[in-house]
Amino acid sequence: MSQGTLYANFRIRTWVPRGLVKALKLDVKVVTPDAAAEQFARDFPLKKVPAFVGPKGYKLTEAMAINYYLVKLSQDDKMKTQLLGADDDLNAQAQIIRWQSLANSDLCIQIANTIVPLKGGAPYNKKSVDSAMDAVDKIVDIFENRLKNYTYLATENISLADLVAASIFTRYFESLFGTEWRAQHPAIVRWFNTVRASPFLKDEYKDFKFADKPLSPPQKKKEKKAPAAAPAASKKKEEAKPAATETETSSKKPKHPLELLGKSTFVLDDWKRKYSNEDTRPVALPWFWEHYNPEEYSLWKVTYKYNDELTLTFMSNNLVGGFFNRLSASTKYMFGCLVVYGENNNNGIVGAVMVRGQDYVPAFDVAPDWESYDYAKLDPTNDDDKEFINNMWAWDKPVSVNGEPKEIVDGKVLK
């Protein structure tokens, strides 16, 4: 009888459970979520991996829980003791859990705060990244100090602690821990190479390469300036100067493209004052729908593309705040809210924004990170779309994510 189905893909937290299935020779089918998309979405609305379905429809999520469950499925008692700790050795069991937790939470969280922005997957803020790197250094010191004196993290053999921690360290070795760093941390490097060569993980490292140098901060794209017209050969230098000055003056303050649409009958500032000073659901929203002109303004659902990389909710809210700050050149043509829903390490960003005109690009592309979001036009004559807008601006109802309600925990208003 089959022992179940494991959903796993390229994500680092799926490496260990997939490796356990192979090394322990479990009768567990391993499939990617994309290969069974409809079934996966029905069984696991959050669409997080790894995920496991056992006999009689038993469902399990979260990597540490799945790893434990898979080891317990093994008939090899010696291997179960090695990976989980002996039943009568409480200290070893606790240490195995401790090191797993440190890697799977504290260390893994910092991937989103260091590697992701350095790769351009999130806005880069030097102060934030430097602070996150300091946190990584402190965690690394804990590992290095342990491994200077011991072969493995928790016991005298490879345990789940080593497998989980090594898999998380992989992303750092690929991106941040270059040749110089590795020379300064020989104990971690020795341990990492030992664990990744084990039967549990060796197949995952076929294409692995150590980084030579750490990732560099992303470079801001410089706008190309139009070449200045060459002065006529017969003109004197003094005569050419006024023309150049005039060109420079006219290019200093380019008009916002939305200014070309002219003045609207819907007074945006009146709406912003109404929203700020009145109760949202009973007073402000009815006023909005009474005065809103769909020919002058369009409404858009804005969704962050990388919700699966978000960690702490306050950091997600800071991400929204930074995005809104970078939209400052367009705020006189916009209004909206982005909210953070869910909980730490399982949250997302979504919202509704109104912009002048029928195209979202001229309003949003003033922010360097505008392409980190998806934009879908909303139809205010559609009851579902209208209710979504009301909910995003009122913040008083849960967000529906794949049919599951998620409480709003924070948010920002663009006004």
Swiss-Prot record:
Pathway: Protein biosynthesis; polypeptide chain elongation
Cellular component per GO, a single term: cytoplasmic stress granule
Entry-linked InterPro entries: EF-GSTs (IPR050802), EF1B_G_C (IPR001662), EF1B_G_C_sf (IPR036433), Glutathione-S-Trfase_C-like (IPR010987), Glutathione-S-Trfase_C_sf (IPR036282), Glutathione_S-Trfase (IPR040079), Glutathione_S-Trfase_N (IPR004045), GST_C (IPR004046)
Keywords: Acetylation, Cytoplasm, Elongation factor, Nucleus, Phosphoprotein, Protein biosynthesis
One biological process term in Gene Ontology: translational elongation
N-acetylserine found at: S2
Compartments where found: Cytoplasm; Nucleus
A GO MF term: guanyl-nucleotide exchange factor activity
CDD domains: GST_C_EF1Bgamma_like, GST_N_EF1Bgamma
UniProt xrefs under Pfam families: EF1G, GST_C, GST_N
Gene3D superfamilies: 1.20.1050.10, Glutaredoxin, Translation elongation factor EF1B, gamma chain, conserved domain
Residues modified as Phosphothreonine: T32
GST C-terminal domain mapped to chain residues: 89-215
Ranges where the EF-1-gamma C-terminal domain occurs: 254-415
Boundaries of every GST N-terminal domain copy: 2-78
Assembly mode: The eukaryotic elongation factor 1 complex (eEF1) is probably a heterohexamer. Two trimeric complexes, each composed of eEF1A (TEF1 or TEF2), eEF1Balpha (EFB1) and eEF1Bgamma (CAM1 or TEF4), are probably dimerized via the eF1Bgamma subunits. The eEF1B subcomplex with the GEF activity is formed of eEF1Balpha and eEF1Bgamma. CAM1 interacts with EFB1. Component of a complex bound to MXR1 promoter region.
Reported function: Subunit of the eukaryotic elongation factor 1 complex (eEF1). Probably plays a role in anchoring the complex to other cellular components. May be involved in transcriptional regulation of MXR1.
PANTHER family registered for this protein in UniProt: ELONGATION FACTOR 1-GAMMA
Note: Present with 60865 molecules/cell in log phase SD medium.
Free-text note regarding domains: Ths GST-like domain mediates the interaction to eEFB1 and may be responsible for dimerization of the eEF1 complex.
Protein's UniProt name: Elongation factor 1-gamma 1
Lineage: Eukaryota, Fungi, Dikarya, Ascomycota, Saccharomycotina
Gene expressing this chain: CAM1
